[in-house]
C-alpha cells in the first residue's frame, strides 16, 4: 500500500542522469520506473557497482539476465533495455553481501558494455522520453485499462483488492502502465516486452491485450473450480449423511453396550468383598457414572477407577504352607547355604502356625551382587505357597511411583505398590523391593520417605494410594528389600528393616552351587544331556579360581554357559562325538587364557603392604605403596583417596614418628623427608579407616628400610597411640584375602567375635591373628620387637594358631 501511494505522487525533480552508469544485472526480476524494490546482492562485480553508485550519484542501471544460471553475464546474456534506478539505502551484511533498496527512475537502452578499472561493468546509456499528450483517446485507453485491471484483481486471489483503488488514482499513462504491469502475475518475458515499449499508449494497449487473456483464463479456472466444488459438495454431503447415519446406529448400539458395561460393574461391585470405606467410595462413583453420558471423558475416568477398585484383592489371600519340613525342603532345593535366611523364614512359619495372624516381616537382604538375594526371595514365596511380585527401585525419583497420581491428572494411575498387589492377585504376596539403596530424589519428591508408610508394620495396614484415595491393608504382605550397601539407605527407612547379611561365597560354596544348580540349569538351557557334557576333576575349581573374581556366581554362570555353547558347537560339527570332557589341560582351548592369577608374588618388598577393604560388591585386597624422598616433611596421598582415608594416613604417620625411638628410626629423618602414599587403581574411589594399620606398617617399613612379608594382609583402624580399633565386614575381607592366596591375616582383637561367621574350610587354611596394638603388627610383619613378648593368635584351629 505504501509502495503504491509513493507511485501515485510525482517527483518534483528528476536527478541528472549521466551518459555512463554502473551496470547491475538481476535475475528473474523486471524493474519498472517508479517501482521501489529491495535487492540482495552477492556477486563481486555487482557489489562493486553498488559501492561505486553510492560513492557518486547513487544511480545504477538495472537490467534483467536472459538466463538466471549465468554467474558472470556478457552483453549477449542481458536484455538491451532496462531501468535507471536510484539507490535509496544500502546495508552491508556480516557475510560480505549487500542489501539495497532501489527506485526505478527511467527506461534506458545500453549502448556500450565494458569492464571498468574498478572491477565493475559500466554501460553507455540512451535515455527514452516518455512524455504523452493528453488526448481523449489516451484517456479512454486509461479508463479501459483500469476497468480491466479491477476485474482482474477481483478474479485473482493473489492480488490485494486495495491495489485497484491506488491504481485508479494515477493520472499519468506511463506511470499507470508501469504500475499495473508490475502487479500482473505473468511470465517475465511478457513483463520485459512491456518494459521495452517506450510509447505509453502502445504499452497500455499491450497491457489491455494481456489483461483480456488473463481474465478469460481466470474465468475458465473459476468455472472449473465451481464445477469441482459442486461435485465435492455433493460427494461430501452424501458422505456426511452416510456417516451421520452410521453414528446414529453406533450411538444406539453403544448405549446398549454402555448399559451392559454398567450392569456388569454393578454386579461385580455387589459380589466383591472389600472394606466399608472402599465400598462407600465405589458406590459414590457408581452413582456419578449412572448420571453421565457413556462417551464423556469423565465417565471414562470413573469407569477406570471403578475397575481398579474392583480388581484389587481386598480380602483374597493365598493359604500359607505351614509344613515346616516341606518349606525347608523347597528352600534347600533352590539354594545352597544361606542358612540365616532359611532359618528366618522357618521361624516366621512356626509363629504363624500358632497365632494364625501375624504382621508380615520387613526383611532387608544386604550383600554383594550375585549372591542370591533376589532368587532366595522367590524361593521364600514358593516355600510359603504365596504369590511373588517384584519391583526395582533403582533410579526411582518420583514419589508418585510409590503412592500413585491423584485422579485430577490426565492419565493418572495407582503407584507401583498397588499395581503389583493387583498383579499378584492376593493381599499377602511375597513382595520384593529390589535395590532400595539406589533410590533417588528430586523436585518431584522423595520416594524413600513414601516407602516409610509401606514398610512400617504399624502404619501399612492403612496404606493410602493417591489414586484410590482409600486405605489398603498391606500388613499381610511379606516385604523383602535388597541392597548392596547400607550407606545410601536413609536412617528413618533403615530403622524399619530387619537386616540379613549375605556374604561372598567361598570357592567350596561356589563349587557346590555350580554342581547342584548352575551346571544342570545351563545344560537344560543349551539342550545338552548330562552324559554329553562332562567336567573332569579339578576343571571346575580352575574355572572358579582363574576365570572368575567375584563375590557371587554371575560370572561363573557366564563362563559355564560359554563352555556349554562351545560343547554344543563341537558336537554339532562332529556328529560322531558322543560327549566332550572339560579337563584342566583343555580349559584354555574353550575359555582362553586365565583372567586371574590367585597366587601372589612371594618376594617381600619395602613399603608395600596389603590391606583389606569392603565394598558394596564384596571384599577386596588393597595394595598400599609408600616411598620416601628428600623434602620438608610433607605427606603426599594419591589413588583417589577419601577424606577419612587421608586422615587415617596422617594418623599412621604421626604414630610412626612418635614411635621412632622404639622402631630404631633416626628422628632427624622426618624433618628433611617427604612421604608419598599411593594406592593403585587410581580411578577407583577408596575411603574408610580400616586401612590404618596397613598404612602405618608401610610407613614404618620405609622408615626402617625393612621389607614387609608379602603373604600377610591386615585390616584395622589405628589411633595416634598405636591402638588397633575394630572394623566392619571382616568376613568379606577374609574371603577376599583367601581368594588372593594370602596365608596370614592380622585383624583387630575386638573383632574376634566375628570369626564365627567365617566358613570353617577358609579358617583352616589361614592364620587369623588378632592384634590390639601396632607393636604387634610391626613385629609380625617386619621384625619382632624385644619388648613385645605376648603376640596373640587365634587358638580356634589347632596347629594353624600361633
Curated annotation (Swiss-Prot):
Q: What is its main location?
A: cytoplasm
The molecular function GO annotations come to: ATP binding; ATP hydrolysis activity; ATP-dependent peptidase activity; sequence-specific DNA binding; serine-type endopeptidase activity
Where ATP is bound, by residue?
367-374
PROSITE patterns membership: LON_N, LON_PROTEOLYTIC, LON_SER
Subcellular localization, per the record? Cytoplasm
Any idea of its EC number?
Answer: 3.4.21.53
Pfam family name, one: Lon_lid
The chain positions of domain Lon N-terminal read 21-215
Which keywords has UniProt assigned to this entry? ATP-binding, Cytoplasm, Hydrolase, Nucleotide-binding, Protease, Serine protease, Stress response
Could you mention a single GO BP entry for this protein? cellular response to heat
InterPro entries with a match to the protein in the record:
AAA+_ATPase, ATPase_AAA_core, Lon_bac, Lon_bac/euk-typ, Lon_lid, Lon_proteolytic, Lon_Prtase, Lon_prtase_N
Catalysed conversion reaction = Hydrolysis of proteins in presence of ATP
Query: Transcription: is it a keyword of this entry?
Result: no
The record's annotation in Gene3D superfamilies points to: 1.10.8.60, 1.20.5.5270, 1.20.58.1480, 3.30.230.10, LON domain-like, P-loop containing nucleotide triphosphate hydrolases
The UniProt record describes its induction as: By heat shock.
Name the top EC class. hydrolase
What quaternary structure, including any partners, is listed in this protein's UniProt entry? Homohexamer. Organized in a ring with a central cavity.
Protein's name according to its UniProt entry: Lon protease
What is the originating organism of this protein? Endomicrobium trichonymphae
Taxonomic lineage: Bacteria, Pseudomonadati, Elusimicrobiota, Endomicrobiia, Endomicrobiales
Q: Which gene encodes it?
A: lon
Amino acid at each position: 500500500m505504501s509502495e503504491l501511494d509513493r507511485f501515485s505522487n510525482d517527483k518534483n525533480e528528476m536527478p541528472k542522469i549521466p551518459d555512463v552508469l554502473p551496470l547491475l544485472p538481476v535475475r528473474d526480476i523486471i524493474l519498472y520506473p517508479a517501482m521501489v524494490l529491495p535487492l540482495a546482492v552477492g556477486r563481486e562485480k555487482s557489489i562493486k557497482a553498488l559501492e561505486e553508485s553510492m560513492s557518486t550519484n547513487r544511480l545504477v542501471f538495472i537490467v534483467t539476465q536472459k538466463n538466471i544460471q549465468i554467474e558472470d553475464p556478457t552483453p549477449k546474456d542481458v536484455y538491451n533495455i532496462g531501468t535507471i534506478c536510484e539507490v535509496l539505502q544500502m546495508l552491508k551484511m556480516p557475510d560480505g553481501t549487500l542489501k539495497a533498496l532501489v527506485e526505478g527512475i527511467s527506461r534506458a537502452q545500453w549502448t556500450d558494455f565494458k569492464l571498468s578499472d574498478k572491477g565493475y561493468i559500466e554501460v553507455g546509456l540512451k535515455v527514452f522520453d516518455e512524455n504523452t499528450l493528453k488526448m481523449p483517446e489516451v484517456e479512454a485507453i486509461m479508463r479501459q485499462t483500469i476497468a480491466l485491471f479491477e476485474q482482474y484483481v477481483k478474479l485473482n486471489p493473489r492480488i490485494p483488492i486495495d491495489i485497484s483503488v491506488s491504481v485508479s488514482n494515477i493520472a499519468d499513462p506511463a506511470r499507470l502502465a508501469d504500475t499495473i504491469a508490475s502487479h500482473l502475475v505473468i511470465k517475465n518475458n511478457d513483463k520485459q516486452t512491456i518494459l521495452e515499449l517506450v510509447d505509453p499508449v502502445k504499452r497500455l494497449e499491450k497491457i489491455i491485450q494481456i489483461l483480456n487473456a488473463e481474465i478469460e483464463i481466470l474465468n475458465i479456472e473459476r468455472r472449473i473450480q465451481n464445477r469441482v466444488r459442486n461435485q465435492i459438495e455433493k460427494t461430501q454431503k452424501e458422505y456426511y449423511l452416510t456417516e451421520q447415519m452410521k453414528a446414529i446406529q453406533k450411538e444406539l448400539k453403544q448405549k446398549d453396550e454402555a448399559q451392559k458395561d454398567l450392569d456388569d460393574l454393578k454386579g461385580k461391585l455387589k459380589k466383591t468383598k472389600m472394606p466399608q470405606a472402599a465400598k462407600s467410595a465405589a458406590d459414590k462413583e457408581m452413582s456419578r457414572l449412572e448420571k453421565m453420558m457413556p462417551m464423556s471423558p469423565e465417565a471414562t475416568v470413573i469407569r477406570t477407577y471403578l475397575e481398579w477398585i474392583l480388581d484389587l484383592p481386598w480380602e483374597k489371600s493365598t493359604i500359607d504352607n505351614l509344613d515346616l519340613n516341606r518349606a525347608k525342603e523347597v528352600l534347600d532345593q533352590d539354594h545352597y547355604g544361606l542358612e540365616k535366611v532359611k532359618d528366618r523364614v522357618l521361624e516366621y512359619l512356626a509363629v504363624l502356625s500358632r497365632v494364625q495372624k501375624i504382621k508380615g516381616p520387613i526383611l532387608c537382604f544386604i550383600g554383594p551382587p550375585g549372591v542370591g538375594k533376589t532368587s532366595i526371595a522367590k524361593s521364600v514365596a514358593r516355600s510359603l505357597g504365596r504369590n511373588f511380585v517384584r519391583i526395582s527401585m533403582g533410579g526411582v525419583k518420583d514419589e508418585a511411583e510409590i503412592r500413585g497420581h491423584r485422579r485430577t491428572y490426565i492419565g493418572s494411575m495407582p503407584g507401583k505398590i498397588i499395581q503389583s498387589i493387583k498383579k499378584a492377585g492376593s493381599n499377602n504376596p511375597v513382595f520384593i523391593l529390589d535395590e532400595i539403596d539406589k533410590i533417588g530424589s528430586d523436585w518431584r519428591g522423595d520416594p524413600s520417605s513414601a516407602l516409610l508408610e509401606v514398610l512400617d508394620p504399624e502404619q501399612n495396614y492403612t496404606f493410602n494410594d493417591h489414586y484410590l484415595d482409600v486405605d489398603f491393608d498391606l500388613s499381610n504382605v511379606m516385604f523383602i528389600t535388597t541392597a548392596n550397601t547400607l550407606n545410601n539407605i536413609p536412617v528413618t527407612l533403615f530403622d524399619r528393616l530387619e537386616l540379613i547379611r549375605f556374604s561372598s561365597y567361598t570357592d567350596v560354596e561356589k563349587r557346590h552351587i555350580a554342581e547342584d544348580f548352575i551346571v544342570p540349569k545351563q545344560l537344560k538351557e543349551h539342550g545338552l544331556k548330562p552324559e554329553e557334557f562332562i567336567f573332569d576333576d579339578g576343571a571346575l575349581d580352575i574355572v572358579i579360581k582363574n576365570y572368575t573374581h567375584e563375590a557371587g556366581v554371575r560370572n561363573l554362570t557366564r563362563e559355564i554357559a560359554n563352555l556349554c555353547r562351545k560343547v554344543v558347537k563341537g558336537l554339532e560339527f562332529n556328529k560322531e562325538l558322543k560327549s566332550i570332557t572339560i579337563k584342566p589341560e583343555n580349559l584354555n582351548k574353550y575359555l582362553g587364557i586365565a583372567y586371574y592369577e590367585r597366587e601372589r608374588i612371594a618376594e617381600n618388598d619395602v613399603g608395600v603392604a596389603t590391606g583389606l577393604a569392603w565394598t558394596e560388591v564384596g571384599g577386596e585386597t588393597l595394595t598400599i605403596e609408600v616411598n620416601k624422598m628428600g623434602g620438608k616433611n610433607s605427606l603426599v596421598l594419591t589413588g583417589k583417596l577419601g577424606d577419612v582415608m587421608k586422615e587415617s594416613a596422617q594418623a599412621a604417620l604421626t604414630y610412626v614418628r612418635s614411635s621412632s625411638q622404639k622402631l630404631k628410626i633416626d628422628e632427624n629423618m622426618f624433618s628433611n623427608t617427604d612421604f608419598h602414599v599411593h594406592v593403585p587403581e587410581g580411578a577407583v574411589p577408596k575411603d574408610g579407616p580400616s586401612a590404618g594399620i596397613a598404612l602405618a606398617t608401610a610407613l614404618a617399613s620405609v622408615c626402617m628400610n625393612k621389607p614387609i612379608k608379602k603373604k600377610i594382609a591386615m585390616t584395622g583402624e589405628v589411633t595416634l597411640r598405636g591402638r588397633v580399633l575394630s572394623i566392619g565386614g571382616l568376613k568379606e575381607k577374609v574371603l577376599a584375602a583367601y581368594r588372593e592366596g594370602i596365608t596370614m591375616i592380622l585383624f583387630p582383637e575386638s573383632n574376634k567375635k566375628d570369626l564365627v561367621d567365617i566358613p570353617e574350610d577358609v579358617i583352616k587354611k589361614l592364620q587369623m591373628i588378632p592384634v590390639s596394638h601396632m607393636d604387634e603388627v610391626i613385629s609380625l610383619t617386619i621384625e619382632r620387637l624385644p619388648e613385645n613378648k605376648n603376640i596373640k593368635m587365634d587358638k580356634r584351629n589347632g596347629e594353624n594358631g600361633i
